[in-house]
Amino acid sequence: MDELASPTHPRMFSLQKIVEISYYNMGRIRLQWSRIWEVIGDHFNKVGCNPNEDVAIFAVDSLRQLSMKFLEKGELANFRFQKDFLRPFEHIMKKNRSPTIRDMVVRCIAQMVNSQAGNIRSGWKNIFSVFHLAASDQDESIVELAFQTTGHISTNVFEKHFPATIDSFQDAVKCLSEFACNASFPDTSMEAIRLIRHCAKYVSDRPQAFKDYTSDDMNVAPEDRVWVRGWFPILFELSCIINRCKLDVRTRGLTVMFEVMKTYGHTFEKHWWQDLFRIVFRIFDNMKLPEQQTEKAEWMTTTCNHALYAISDVFTQYFESLSDVLLDDILAQLYWCVQQDNEQLARSGTNCLENVVILNGEKFTPETWDKTCNCMLDIFKTTIPHALLTWRPAGAEGDPMTPQDISDRQLVCTVGLPVSLVYLLCQIRPYSNITQYHADKITSAHVPSGLNFPEQRLFSALLIKCVVQLELIQTIDNMVFFPATSRKEDVENLAAAQRDALDAADVLVETQDQGMYRYLTSEQLFKLLDCLLESHRFAKAFNANNEQRTTLWKAGFKGKSKPNLLKQETSSLACGLRILFRMYTDDSRQTAWEEVQRRLLNVCSEAVAYFLTLTSESHREAWTNLLLLFLTKVLKISDDRVRISTINNIDRPLIWSVEVERGEVAGEEAQ
């Protein structure tokens, strides 16, 4: 080393002799040669990192020649000397920052791969380690050559010599992952992800190679080796790409990760899925989300949103395998999504819950239904925007009315209404023609910059809760009755009312159960009903509290008009009544008829009493349409049980309100 210390004229005589000694002793038995190389290899480590580039170049070139000669000898099974022999390349690549030397190391390794791939065994680990270090470089030529060689190994060498490379398979995948995470070369990133996807094919086509593989440091059951050595490294590295890269690359990584699951998941064992989803759920980990609000919002709106739908698809595709081991985790993840201050993610959470139920509900066990209904109940309870009724600007005084106060004031003790009233009201859906004239989309609210930051956050969170409430109402309606059925009923009811055609020849509503209604117990339906009515009563309380709505409006909670929850008020009641009426006409639920009738009469009485207190023309108009459809359905009901039990209980206020409405219509026509 002293001879090489001169910065201008280093003497390389001794280094040359060391190279010759290595060359002539290469034929010794492994035990002897390994001891010799232990000393010589350490010397090459130091010389290869010499600040004098000429010395380092000589050392690397000498190493290349020795390595080519050594690799020609091949390597017997269970030996690891190639790994020791090639380690100086790895050390030099890690420690030497000279672009010239690093480029030279990569070229030396590339030459070995191209000429000696068939003889390399344990040396693959060093090769991938060198390329892994090159993958994060900023020098385009280094990255390009390293990636080309890695791609050649992944597509050609693996195809021909897979058993010899299997020990380094996960190193290859890790190396490709590092290329994908180099933000300076986006094209290389995308191609690296494609190659990882290609590696999945080797695992699928050659599972026996993984089962047969053994090593001293491997204490894994043969049936799990294909997971530990094959599938897990691929999926784990894809998850690392998702967590480390910018949007376009991580989106591609996410897509490929779920493509692998969907394509090859049928070969996965149940406990493999548990390991896999521990990785997947890291995408939603609060501790791993970006700290900046803008980046966090982008992450939730794009990556979390994409992952959520993909998880739902995979869960549906492999429901039989996953329902026992992952249902609780998936429901918990959906619940987490609707709790975040991100409207898109909250909507997606409810939509995915709906998809999971509609696509798999026929296969649900009673226990699964209980868990699902409880999840919906939890979401409903935690997303009711109670602060809408209690918020006051700084310095304001006064106690706002609670939902219970409003409900108590409006609930009038009346004689029970005909059960047939339900039929009309339960057919009305928030997106039908009946409510098209409403300009009540609270999600279009504008929060002015004049509010301080905590109030902005509060208003934003309240708006998202309003969105979730509407989405959940729609989810329950779609889940229980199936979307197409409900929409068809709405159209038929409205058409009948508009034609004023009351004879039996009119189009009859189909009553076949296309949704999940027949799979839900009465107790589960009552749970959902309670959620709907709680949501309805809250919306009703808010809509009736003009003072609070005005306060929020002045604070900028909604832009051009007072905020309202008309859609939540009407759609929740319509869905609840739809459920009650269906149960009341279901012969298989006779044991629940008494409870259903009691609930029907209470709900209908409360609804009509509330309608009679309305003063807003648009508000009354919405309910007038509901009553109009109700009357149309009453005259079509032919169920003697319904008529006998309710004919004498028609509420006088209802008749009076209809007469008033008819009088107003007649007066307008006369004018």
Please give the residue ranges for each predicted region.
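Intrinsic low-complexity, polar/charged intrinsically disordered segments
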Residues: 499-671
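Short coil/turn segments at helix-helix junctions and helix-capping linkers
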Residues: 2-12, 28-31, 43-58, 73-76, ...
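Acidic, Ser/Thr- and Gly/Pro-rich intrinsically disordered linkers and low-complexity segments
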Residues: 1-9, 99-100, 209-222, 284-304, ...
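Aromatic/pi-system hotspot detector in well-structured domains
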Residues: 18, 33, 37, 82, ...
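Short alpha-helical linear motifs
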Residues: 81-85, 128-131, 147-150, 169-172, ...
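Extended repeat-based solenoid scaffolds, especially LRR ectodomains
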Residues: 1-18, 437-453, 457-461, 465-486, ...
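Surface-exposed polar/charged interaction patches
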Residues: 286, 290, 379-382, 386, ...
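HEAT-repeat alpha-solenoid elements in large eukaryotic scaffold proteins
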Residues: 7-25, 39-44, 56-69, 85-88, ...
